[in-house]
């Protein structure tokens, strides 16, 4: 199929790395692996920080819609429109209308709907997301949490599940050589949930200063100085590795002993899958979408949300139990390479799309 791919929040071609950009790219790779021809049909970002900023986008949205309509007067039409991550701050203003005009299926992945926004100034954009979900031939959710949310808001919506995945090829190529006391984390340094996780991690490590550990941090961002400040009390124990390529990250993770990231507000967190693919057990919180990517008690330890002492205790437990740490690391690698690979995702995604097309 010819797939018109659109990510209203952040294009897969955006220069700034993020989980959203990575998942958009992974979806494209999975679609292509399944034999589909994928085109990113628009770079237009509808993401807006305020309702006022959203309203100001209207003229540009109209111009982009006109461009897209003209495009398919001259070029072969797509067989399907695929929208990744529409939600109230970044709805898809193009796909539903174009799909209807071209008589092709409209599909969403990771659509999100928060009913509490219905009573705010975001109500107009929220309504657009709801209409798109109801129009969709299928709405693909990556976590049970998201699927249940859509089902509750739109009982008649057509839903399907695709578990979070990564391209595991880079990790299959590296041989784990863990330093048992080396803690690893990979995360952007920005305000909000990321900063909250960094702060919680620093607090937890203060509770286990007497344990033999070092921490290697991969990532960068606008809050770099503030993040460094959180860990200023650990001289000689923190290694700042900055932003790295996918290949470098795979190699660095393979040298680690335990992956530590609290995961405050994480939709799911692809970095957890990358760490497990490299053979690292995970210590995270049982919060948001994290349980969708870590098998509690098998590939890692998940602690109660907000409990710093429990989180510190879980890190200490794995530091002190080499047999358990090694067993979890091996299970983690098997879990991702066998169940959460690009090949597996491509198969499932292809089945979902073909079924959706047949039902249209």
Stretches with model-predicted labels:
Residues 264:
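Aromatic "clamp/platform" in nucleotide-sugar-dependent glycosyltransferases that forms part
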Residues 175-196, 202-206, 216:
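Conserved donor-binding/catalytic core segment of Leloir-type glycosyltransferases
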Residues 145, 165:
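Carbohydrate-associated surface elements
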Residues 122-139:
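Membrane-proximal helix-turn-helix segments that form the acceptor-binding/catalytic region
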Residues 225-247:
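Nucleotide-activated donor-binding/catalytic signature segment of Leloir-type glycosyltransferases, i.e.
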Residues 243-244, 251-256:
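Short alpha-helical donor nucleotide-sugar binding micro-motif in glycosyltransferases
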Residues 281-284, 294:
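Short hydrophobic beta-strand element within catalytic cores of glycosyltransferases
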Residues 296-297, 301-308, 317-323:
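Conserved acidic donor-binding segment of nucleotide-sugar-dependent glycosyltransferases
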């Amino acid at each position: 199929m010819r797939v018109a791919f659109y990510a209203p929040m952040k294009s897969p071609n955006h220069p700034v790395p993020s989980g959203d950009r990575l998942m958009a790219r992974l979806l494209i790779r999975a679609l292509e692996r399944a034999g589909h021809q994928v085109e990113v049909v628009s770079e237009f970002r509808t993401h807006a920080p305020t309702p006022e900023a959203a309203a100001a986008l209207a003229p540009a949205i109209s111009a982009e819609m006109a461009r897209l309509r003209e495009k398919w007067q001259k070029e072969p039409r797509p067989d399907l429109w695929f929208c990744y991550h529409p939600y109230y701050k970044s709805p898809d203003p193009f796909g539903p209308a174009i799909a209807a005009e071209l008589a092709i299926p409209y599909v969403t992945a990771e659509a999100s709907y928060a009913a509490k926004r219905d009573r705010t100034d975001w109500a107009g954009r929220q309504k657009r997301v709801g209409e798109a979900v109801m129009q969709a031939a299928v709405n693909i959710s990556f976590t049970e949490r998201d699927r249940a949310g859509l089902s509750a808001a739109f009982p008649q919506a057509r839903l399907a599940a695709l578990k979070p995945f990564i391209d595991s090829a880079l990790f299959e190529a590296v041989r784990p050589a863990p330093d048992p006391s080396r803690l690893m984390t990979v995360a952007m340094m920005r305000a909000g949930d990321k900063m909250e996780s960094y702060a919680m991690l620093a607090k937890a490590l203060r509770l286990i200063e007497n344990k033999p550990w070092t921490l290697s941090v991969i990532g960068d961002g606008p809050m770099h100085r503030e993040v460094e400040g959180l860990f200023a009390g650990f001289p000689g124990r923190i290694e700042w590795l900055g932003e790295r390529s996918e290949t470098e990250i795979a190699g660095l993770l393979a040298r680690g002993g335990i992956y530590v990231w609290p995961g405050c507000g994480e939709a799911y967190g692809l970095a957890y899958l990358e760490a497990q693919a490299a053979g690292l057990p995970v210590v995270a919180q049982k919060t948001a979408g994290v349980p969708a990517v870590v098998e509690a008690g098998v590939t890692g330890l998940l602690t109660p949300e907000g409990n710093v002492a429990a989180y510190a205790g879980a890190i200490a437990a794995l530091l002190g139990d080499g047999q358990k740490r090694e067993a979890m690391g091996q299970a983690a690698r098997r879990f991702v390479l066998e169940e959460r690979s690009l090949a597996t995702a491509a198969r499932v995604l292809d089945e979902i799309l073909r079924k959706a097309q047949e039902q249209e």
